[in-house]
Swiss-Prot record:
Biased composition regions of type Low complexity, renumbered to the chain: 125-139, 593-604
Modification comment: Isoform 1 is highly susceptible to proteolytic degradation and is stabilized by the interaction with RAB27A.
Lineage of producing organism: Eukaryota, Metazoa, Chordata, Craniata, Vertebrata
CDD domains: C2B_SLP_1-2-3-4
Top-level division of the source organism's lineage: Eukaryota
Biased composition annotated in UniProt, kind: Polar residues: 161-191, 219-229, 392-415, 430-440
Subunit (UniProt): Monomer. Binds NRXN1. Interacts with RAB27B. Binds RAB27A that has been activated by GTP-binding.
Record comment regarding domains: The RabBD domain mediates interaction with RAB27A and recruitment on to vesicular structures in cytotoxic T-lymphocytes (CTL). The C2 1 domain mediates binding to phosphatidylserine (PS) and phosphatidylinositol 4,5-bisphosphate (PIP2) and localization to the cell membrane.
Gene Ontology CC entries for this record: cytoplasm; cytosol; exocytic vesicle; melanosome; membrane; plasma membrane
InterPro entries documented for this protein: C2_dom (IPR000008), C2_domain_sf (IPR035892), FYVE_2 (IPR041282), Rab_BD (IPR010911), SYTL1-5_C2B (IPR043567)
Entries under SUPFAM superfamilies matching the protein: C2 domain (Calcium/lipid-binding domain, CaLB)
Tissue-specificity statement: Isoform 1 is expressed in hematopoietic lineages with a strong expression in CD4 and CD8 T-lymphocytes. It is also widely expressed in nonhematopoietic tissues. Isoform 5 is expressed only in nonhematopoietic tissues. Isoform 4 is expressed in pancreatic alpha cells.
Protein name per its UniProtKB record: Synaptotagmin-like protein 2
Amino acid sequence: MIDLSFLTEEEQEAIMKVLQRDAALKRAEEERVRHLPEKIKDDQQLKNMSGQWFYEAKAKRHRDKIHGADIIRASMRKKRPQIAAEQSKDRENGAKESWVNNVNKDAFLPPELAGVVEEPEEDAAPASPSSSVVNPASSVIDMSQENTRKPNVSPEKRKNPFNSSKLPEGHSSQQTKNEQSKNGRTGLFQTSKEDELSESKEKSTVADTSIQKLEKSKQTLPGLSNGSQIKAPIPKARKMIYKSTDLNKDDNQSFPRQRTDSLKARGAPRGILKRNSSSSSTDSETLRYNHNFEPKSKIVSPGLTIHERISEKEHSLEDNSSPNSLEPLKHVRFSAVKDELPQSPGLIHGREVGEFSVLESDRLKNGMEDAGDTEEFQSDPKPSQYRKPSLFHQSTSSPYVSKSETHQPMTSGSFPINGLHSHSEVLTARPQSMENSPTINEPKDKSSELTRLESVLPRSPADELSHCVEPEPSQVPGGSSRDRQQGSEEEPSPVLKTLERSAARKMPSKSLEDISSDSSNQAKVDNQPEELVRSAEDVSTVPTQPDNPFSHPDKLKRMSKSVPAFLQDESDDRETDTASESSYQLSRHKKSPSSLTNLSSSSGMTSLSSVSGSVMSVYSGDFGNLEVKGNIQFAIEYVESLKELHVFVAQCKDLAAADVKKQRSDPYVKAYLLPDKGKMGKKKTLVVKKTLNPVYNEILRYKIEKQILKTQKLNLSIWHRDTFKRNSFLGEVELDLETWDWDNKQNKQLRWYPLKRKTAPVALEAENRGEMKLALQYVPEPVPGKKLPTTGEVHIWVKECLDLPLLRGSHLNSFVKCTILPDTSRKSRQKTRAVGKTTNPIFNHTMVYDGFRPEDLMEACVELTVWDHYKLTNQFLGGLRIGFGTGKSYGTEVDWMDSTSEEVALWEKMVNSPNTWIEATLPLRMLLIAKISK
């Protein structure tokens, strides 16, 4: 059963209409299912079409077979019995010692006692006089719902002596409503008082106590005797203070016990299921707190988990007659589970994502709120403070929180700060989420922020977050922060939008010392990473650019300088060793992190900001500007018994210094058997650090037949291993094994070979690598009819490959990868499935890349590569590079813009014929494969 006592009659009627419509739909569905056996003879098909499979699966997963509509319908049918005031017999001093006297001089019902107070048992400890103060009107609602629900949830039935057995229930409920409508709370209480006195004289003492208590409350509320409708006080922010000074010792000891007994007697968790999806940003937040305290802690019983919190503006207390100033009710959840913490889904301003409103917020319009749903444990006069940075870092790594940590109430005009939770669940369940969740600040003044907050009150939580959260400009590093400061009236380019999303995503979490309680332009978003990405992407705060930032070579170079810090190895046989200088011919790479690489979009041109400075590969002809010098000492021998080629690498001397300042390098030797220049044929020695004369004394072994070996070439190259994997080429030696004299003993001895510069293997270009049949299409306006200019899409349809080479004998398991250059990020790369056991695989796979403007088509290039997947490695077979082949991209010379005439013709046809598939069959070739970045 659900406590629906807070619903108005209009709200109940609206819910009943929904329930009636649901019942009508169920009847229609049952009628359809009843006639199904006449039409369908197959039992399995009948099971699927009738929905029987769903209920069987549900029965296995959920024990509760009661539908939500049935629960609400049963709750709506319950009537309100007359008042029972036995909860006030032990509270003679409640009005004096209660915190209500210090707040707003009104009778108040704590949330944990609302609808739960029952007749105490004989063995129960006496309740504390100050533990609860009862609002007469709200007690009628809560007690009525609890008394009617007790036979369903309590282990034993309890009779309320104050419920009249002579008066019919319907008449009692109607009389209560009439009295309430005429005389407000006073009339309602008087009616219940008369019922008590006429019902039982034995309880006259309790009734007199209630009357005396009411008289005291009337003195504090001058407008109550006039029969006017008194508006409930607006709840203030909860203060979690663990030390009490104005409660006596006996009351303190009995208070947790009373709460425990009254709540455990219910037998089942209770939830107030009111949610407002269109609430403002100062709505109540769901605070989950679970901490074991001693009985003298005076806060929470050990057997309870109380989820509650309030965030509101203080100025709403001054003007509570305005509907706009009223804050939504605080929602309190009770759970009888002690050890298990409830799973916390992603929250947006305290709301569960996807949670819809059960009730409409009519109370905001009418200016009414129920004050019986709030309670504040406030005994310590010391003001609470936020945690210091040291405490914050300690709490993120420790599952417990210091008891001295409290919540700061919101000041006037303050902006709610989510995530400042002094509870253990968030810190234990999602420590990484708290540490990694960015702090996103508003770059606006307070007045404009408050004005904008008023305009987004009726929005949903998702929309509300997207309007209330904006990236902080100071968090965006590098040139993107400077570029954002330039304004324009043009549409922001997709590149800048991606820069903004990437910058917002890379912002580290700020310490709590940067968040002030009276600041109105800051908000800390504590939600799941995927939700944070979505909310950050919804923000459009990037000023428009008068020109394309990639049209300037200097700007493009500056952006690519910081990219190498994010490069990493990949197990797809894209060469891990690259030259110290890229095809952009940069003088030196920075080793600082960049916010321009970690992009989540799979579009090619949207994430152009991740322009990689590394387009080197094993087939590239540009290997940096380091001077190649020195010698290497090694020997080779073929062992017939093992059928292995042994390459004994002894040492090197007089190598070039990669670190010019310190005159040292970290060299290692890498060996290939050409033409198989992939990871399957690559062998490497260990890295000898900080020397120009490394000594290895290692043997590199190749398991290969001698007849096949005579068709190979041995390539030994020396590389400097950089900390950030930007490896520099130091020289190489190449031996033609076809002409090698294996019988000459001199060739088996260690010999010195001078190192030479790298030369591109032109002979490999002429080899037949197979063909690819594909089709391209450019869609300039994917969503027609929009007023604002939109970016286009490039569709790549990979149909099949023909006559692929066999590099592993008769085994082949091929697949195709696609990358839109200059974007080499992993997240923008797409690939087909692997098709094995054939040299003519049929893929029939379409890849879509968005974010293309007409001018981007002139600078971009589609790189399609075919790979042979074998165990944990992938071997390159061939590829295409479809573009205009100008050799430049956004004004910068690049070596990947090297399309052949056939590839250029296909790209030109696609650009000149939008919304049309252009088919072609192109020969695969060896490529200068661009290195993949993160």
